[in-house]
């Protein structure tokens, strides 16, 4: 959604959608300035999150892989509403109803990205051509199969124009003048309900979605990318961020390699599983551990499973900032100035000393208290450490989490003694410099401040406000550091579950199709041949080892009963013949197992549907 000021600017310049009325209806053309403003907002949003893959969801010329899963919001009979232009909704969103009217009119300064129109036959309901909706979604002038699009979005009622309506749209510039025949169209409200922020100028996830409550339940973020970007916008991003150009070229090379049927997975350098996963220890180690544990002797043992460890000691990494010197608060208390801005303390100090009795000058408060270097001794916290119990050895331990935090505290910030005011020390606050004047950067969660503006603002703080400011900044430092650590540990967990599923550690989402269609077949096709001399029979024996998939292998499931309800595309959509005909609900991915080994082929105890890469070995003897 465009900001209020941006939306008002569009309207003030007279570039609101131009209205063309006639006997058949009215047409609302989207102004070009609105499209340019939309592109500017999207470009700004992408540049802000370009370094966060979980929000950008690359590649940019594809749809984001995290999208809103829509409910079944119409009935099975597809009953039409009172306007006879869309299906009646049996499920609504209270927040979404505040964003759009019953006739498709948007509220809250929102604008559609496509041209809309009305027909007198439909009582003023806003309509839109289906081809315009597809063009906005795909950001391309290429033609797409409308019938396939309708099948994918079967909750939208599609209508066709009459000959008179086609001429009206052609006359008013919605379609080319030489167009003939019928055109498919839908209501603008249906497009907003189905696609949400994707059809709104400057649309943001959740904010401009109809299903706002559902988006929050699905843990979507309002900062994540919404639109599939055009080639023009991607080139502008590459121009503004030259480092992004290299990533785009590498992605293009990967795509071209895939088109030549070359396996990118086999050439990829995947990570070893040993730093991530610790396998089950031997029986001797387990017995020794149990025996010593029974005697009360607790020895360290290898715990099978993930090796995700690493202590983060809060006291060592995040010290509470101190913006006061040793005597700052004592001086303010004696002057009764705890609620007076520190910029006036010098004046109050002069008055305090002038009112002091004779002979007391020796005990008067100093005018300027020198800056005290921060103590290297960490301040103790209630939670001195997290993630591990033993923190004594964590100080000397170089974990990946601690390495993630080091750049925040090393070589990025210099103390600015010019920020100290009457003994109050603000020298640790980050300031903008000539090196980063053109960038929006942060230091430990705090923005880089303008020196002159910051100095005037600091003079207005009172000692009580400084106490609160120290704790607020401390919370920002800790939260920023923990978020960085969470990113590292999230990657570790993803790698761990990749290993447990039989996937090469580090497999990318873009390689998933190749993994299923080519890599797994290559894994099954692997054989090993060894030749040994048998002294008893005085012959050479050739042993051929082949891989045979067990029921845990992807596409080799041996479960043949009812389908679980969660496999259907819609939650409320269940086939009517489930109870009557069991053959109608067999798994589509069922593969007949021709293995002669009954243990491998028919073991139901080990069956777990749709694991990715589990297999067993079969040995054949050839003399």
Curated annotation (Swiss-Prot):
<comment type="function">
    <text>Involved in transcriptional activation. Component of the SWI/SNF complex, an ATP-dependent chromatin remodeling complex, which is required for the positive and negative regulation of gene expression of a large number of genes. It changes chromatin structure by altering DNA-histone contacts within a nucleosome, leading eventually to a change in nucleosome position, thus facilitating or repressing binding of gene-specific transcription factors.</text>
</comment>
<dbReference type="GO" id="GO:0031490">
    <property type="term" value="F:chromatin DNA binding"/>
</dbReference>
<keyword id="KW-0805">Transcription regulation</keyword>
<dbReference type="GO" id="GO:0006357">
    <property type="term" value="P:regulation of transcription by RNA polymerase II"/>
</dbReference>
<keyword id="KW-0539">Nucleus</keyword>
<keyword id="KW-0804">Transcription</keyword>
<dbReference type="GO" id="GO:0005634">
    <property type="term" value="C:nucleus"/>
</dbReference>
<keyword id="KW-0156">Chromatin regulator</keyword>
<dbReference type="GO" id="GO:0016514">
    <property type="term" value="C:SWI/SNF complex"/>
</dbReference>
<dbReference type="Pfam" id="PF08624">
    <property type="entry name" value="CRC_subunit"/>
</dbReference>
<dbReference type="GO" id="GO:0006338">
    <property type="term" value="P:chromatin remodeling"/>
</dbReference>
<comment type="similarity">
    <text>Belongs to the RSC7/SWP82 family. SWP82 subfamily.</text>
</comment>
<dbReference type="InterPro" id="IPR013933">
    <property type="entry name" value="CRC_Rsc7/Swp82"/>
</dbReference>
<dbReference type="GO" id="GO:0016586">
    <property type="term" value="C:RSC-type complex"/>
</dbReference>
<protein>
    <recommendedName>
        <fullName>SWI/SNF global transcription activator complex subunit SWP82</fullName>
    </recommendedName>
</protein>
<dbReference type="GO" id="GO:0000785">
    <property type="term" value="C:chromatin"/>
</dbReference>
<comment type="subunit">
    <text>Interacts with SWI3 and SNF12. Component of the SWI/SNF global transcription activator complex. The 1.14 MDa SWI/SNF complex is composed of 11 different subunits: one copy each of SWI1, SNF2/SWI2, SNF5, SNF12/SWP73, ARP7/SWP61, ARP9/SWP59; two copies each of SWI3, SNF6, SNF11, SWP82; and three copies of TAF14/SWP29.</text>
</comment>
<dbReference type="GO" id="GO:0005829">
    <property type="term" value="C:cytosol"/>
</dbReference>
<keyword id="KW-0010">Activator</keyword>
